Amino acid sequence: MPYFEVNFDPFIALGKITNSPVSNPLNLLSFVESVGAAGISFTYGPETGQMNNVTLLRSMTNCRINIRVPVDMQVLQKAVLLRPDIVTLCDMEREDTTVQIPSKSIKELVDTVLNIEDLGIAIRLKPDVKQLKEAYQMGIDEIEIATNELAHHDKQTPFLECLEKITHTIHIGIKNNLRIAAGGELDRRLIRALNEVIDVEFISVGKALLSRSLMWGLENTLKEFNEVIDIR
């Protein structure tokens, strides 16, 4: 059964233009956990404010804390000092924020984190078996498979082909004892489609969670997504 991870990045982005309570993740932490979420994530940066105080976050929630980090050594080192549970390397210059491997610079970043006790390292990849195998050889703790492409298909055949590519990659990862997460423009329909064919460690949801909560309320939306993720 997958765990539910709430990606707070869209909420933080909303906070730049409004002071609504829903735009401040600190207001939502204990509430998010109470409705069944097991993880939270956000991208490291000055605009995240108090979210960078992981000690404070731990006093407010038992959720796994996943900090998304750009492929930059200085930024990674700063994020590591916060001592989250896991850091996920992402390429913020790419539309789907995936990294590409093999890459000498990515390997150097991974090696920086690998031997740190009680800190996991993840990378965000396209659903590509070759890159997955590269990640395995690097000793990565967890792979987040980008599902963005799935959201862009509105016709059945390309949708099913994309879904097959994603599930095949995830199957290979699980077979090799890799922890696999999935995220990227996921809504309830896409989560149901994934859950019908594959099991992952975490399912990360952000934009769809925010947009639906603005219409139907955060509590109802969180419960709704948690139920969809929880159904196997």
Task: Tell me what each language-model feature is.
Residues 2-8, 40-42, 63-69, 85-89, ...:
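Hydrophobic faces of well-ordered beta-strands that scaffold small-molecule active sites
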Residues 6, 32, 79, 135, ...:
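Conserved, mostly hydrophobic/aromatic
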Residues 7-13, 45-47, 68-74, 92-94, ...:
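Active-site beta-loop-alpha junctions enriched in small/polar residues
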Residues 72-85, 127-139, 180-182, 186-200:
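Catalytic cores of alpha/beta
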Residues 87-95, 142-154, 198-218:
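Glycine-rich phosphate-binding active-site loops on the catalytic face of alpha/beta enzymes
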Residues 120-172, 176:
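Histidine/lysine/aspartate-rich catalytic loop segments that bind and position anionic ligands
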Residues 155-159, 211-232:
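C-terminal helical cap(s) of enzyme catalytic domains, especially alpha/beta-barrels
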